[in-house]
Amino acid sequence: MNSLDQWRDTWAKVLSIQPSEIDDQDSFFDLGGDSVKAIQLLSEAAQSAINVDLQTFYDNFWNIISPQLRGENRSGPIDRGGSIATGEADDSIGLLKTDVNLEVVEKALSKVNIARESVCRMAPISSIQEFFLYLGLNGHVGLINYVYQVEGRDLKQGLARLVKHLEAKNPIFRTVMIEDDTGKFTQVQLSHSISTWTYPTDLQAYLDETMTGRQRLGASPVRYSLVLKDERHKGQNFFVISLDHTHCDAFSRYLIDKEILQILKQPTEYASLQNPERPWYGDFVKHNRAHILDEQLSRYWASYMQGATLANVHPLSEAVVGGELDGEMVEIVPIPVVSQSRGTRGQTNPSHVILAAWAMALSKHSGLKDITFGLARHGRSSDSFTDLRRVMGPLVTGTPFRVTLNDTQERTEQLLNRVKEEVLKTARWEQGMVPNIHPDAEGNPWVQSMVNLKSELYGFGNESWTGDEAEADITAIKMRRDLQQYEFKSNWAILLSTLQKQGQLRLRMYYQSQLLSHDKAQALFASFKSLIAELAAADGSLVTGLLD
């Protein structure tokens, strides 16, 4: 992006508004943005080597970015370029110094037939990686499948070349997990890929098969598949990237799509030395450990959770580890639009309405006025790690989210503003060992519902690409997110997923019927839907009036 007008168009596309609606004084939240959409747009900024810290972006993006795009000089929290500190080399193995024991790791490498000469970097694994690794090793979580419909003269050769470029610039595809004799896991970045290809004849059968396997230590985290002339899909061809969940998240799909399109459009420029390798997730884990101390994190969350009651869906004694989400309810409703009463124009973010409505629905269900549930976070709020917005990996995490509803004089607008502040305040502490989200060794209780606010990453940018050369190895590619599937067992009684898309809000509630009967689930879901509409139309009404 080279002009202010182009940036304005990009912003408008992300927010699903007209460019003319964006004023220089608007904040991101005023225009209906949320943290995931912010990351999406900031990723575009990173392509132009412009880094803006997330908080500044929320507060007033245009006053800061406009001078940069006009070529003016202005001091402020913007950094152009920059590199990641990679640490000191250890000559004994040619690796970066980490907190891992090199001798122990070398033994673990030999067990999985990985030569130490092929190792570039090592790092501990993150808590979210450990969570998904245990699920994967025990067969409780399938692979993440990214499906593309493809056309071309020689797809095998063309896709092999595309994958070679992709793996060269993105170290997450060359990262394997190992375990030493002490039971400690380490992620290892290799100098070359050990990925494999398969050529199934039936796409759906292949996708089903990827849901039943187990993750293997020392194995490639990625598998590529090419399905030619699938009969179930009218002879169409499909390219599938299948990844372990320890190596990706929802935003990684968006980044992978951008990389693929760049490779297809500008293969020479993409492969050049001027196009640097993307930051490695393992470096982010080490950075996090150095900058966010576990004791600070523990103190924050201990204070945050003091006096919280987590039993707002079922009694604590009934909690299940790895239960089946065998119930499902789906509804599509209009995106809630709440007009602000303040002097400036703007809207309350729909995400804040959703969070407030869910807290109120749980309050009605449980009779409690102090509600805590889990909130899935994109994990990319930090501005201290260079180019974090281009890091592929499982940065998505979860934190407790607490809403009190015992103020009899509080009005709906005050509640929504309080929810907004809570989202920003807790985002700083989203990485690390966050308590009360999953079962732990100490037997502490965990949240009984998890809310995943999916933004409109779907539908942004190029959904397909068609080349100029009719005889090229790859002539067309189309992202087929509609064919993705993902299943896993849950420790939460409820997984609430929302998706904002094309002016509508899709609500999907998965639940464990052994913890929440169908009748109660139906009543809770109906209450949630009703409260979304009531909050949008409340116009400053008392919150207690909506809870009665």
From Swiss-Prot:
Protein name: Nonribosomal peptide synthetase 8
Keyword list, A-Z: Ligase, Phosphopantetheine, Phosphoprotein
Organism: Gibberella moniliformis (strain M3125 / FGSC 7600)
Function: Nonribosomal peptide synthetase; part of the gene cluster that mediates the biosynthesis of fumonisins B1 (FB1), B2 (FB2), B3 (FB3), and B4 (FB4), which are carcinogenic mycotoxins. The biosynthesis starts with the FUM1-catalyzed carbon chain assembly from one molecule of acetyl-CoA, eight molecules of malonyl-CoA, and two molecules of methionine (in S-adenosyl form).
Higher taxonomy: Eukaryota, Fungi, Dikarya, Ascomycota, Pezizomycotina
Protein family: Belongs to the NRP synthetase family.
Pfam families from the UniProt entry: Condensation (PF00668), PP-binding (PF00550)
Pathway given in the UniProt record: Mycotoxin biosynthesis
GO molecular function, one term: phosphopantetheine binding
Domain of life: Eukaryota
EC number: 6.3.2.-
Disruption of the gene: reported phenotype: Loses the ability to produce fumonisins, but accumulates two new metabolites, HFB3 and HFB4, which are biosynthetic precursors of fumonisins lacking the tricarballylic esters.
Cysteines paired by S-S bonds: none
